[in-house]
């Protein structure tokens, strides 16, 4: 008779508390090791981020600042050279060439992978069309003003646009104008009066020219004067108002479209081309005689090259501006922009023989001080606004 089945007893040692603790210790050490590695990675990422966000040294800031200043001077000088021809009247054609070159340049740079912006979209174009039209008016009136005014006077009067923009922001965006800002505005107006004083007094003190036969006053004057005053001041006033409208309405439209800097530049130039071409064909004289006067054979190649170069320079200005803001910060950039008006104004004296008299020099100096005071005022205002927002959010200023 067979024996009943009896399971073989387990003669192995049961798990001891020490072996269980060993497994727990191994899991804990793995967890701690993972946490340590993750902490090391986070610390390295934080160090790299802090390194990127740290303000570059003064030596690192020199190149972007010089690039921004050089781009501003170069653009002003080239435009002044192009429009200063004795018989140049085809401003719309000039602007069309500049815009075409600019679009070609940014498209090429985009394909090379250096920048990125939106592809063309009909809805975006429809929304941005009024802004491009305003830009055409800004550039055209600015070119006409630069045609009749010296670079120092043009640069100084351009400051008046800041006043119009500031008060436009008060009405459209609930902005505010501080006392220091008002001081800068007073200096801007004063510098403009100093710059234009010689022309103003010449109009007041000018004796009427009489016809030797009839003895009557001769009222026919050169095309460059309106009411005896340099026509450039009329164009400059129009430019200031249109420039302020362009900046204010573009700010509102950017909120709708969500455009970035390169998007704005691309659409501005692309949409302005058909407007400029139509105005050039309708208004400007395309006859052979007019073309010969506007583009004389003696410097035709140089003139056309300067037009194309100025279009490409617009891309350089946009890049150098973004580079300067990124490296130096908005405060330093605003100060550089204020002080940069001095070499831009001085370029007219150096390259175009504008008189270096007491009126011009003092106007440039007062305008430079006005720009610095305005930059300081805007910086202080930004700090106050940031502190106010921090208090509203419940944080510490």
Curated annotation (Swiss-Prot):
A GO cellular component annotation in the UniProt record: endoplasmic reticulum membrane
Out of the domains of life, which is the source?
Eukaryota
One of the GO biological process terms: GDP-mannose transmembrane transport
- Per the UniProt entry, the signal peptide is none
Q: Which UniProt keywords apply?
A: Cytoplasmic vesicle, Endoplasmic reticulum, Glycoprotein, Golgi apparatus, Membrane, Sugar transport, Transmembrane, Transmembrane helix, Transport
Q: What is its main location?
A: Golgi
Report biased composition (Basic and acidic residues) as residue ranges: 34-54
Name of this chain's protein: GDP-mannose transporter 1
What is the organism of origin for this protein?
Answer: Cryptococcus neoformans var. neoformans serotype D (strain JEC21 / ATCC MYA-565) (Filobasidiella neoformans)
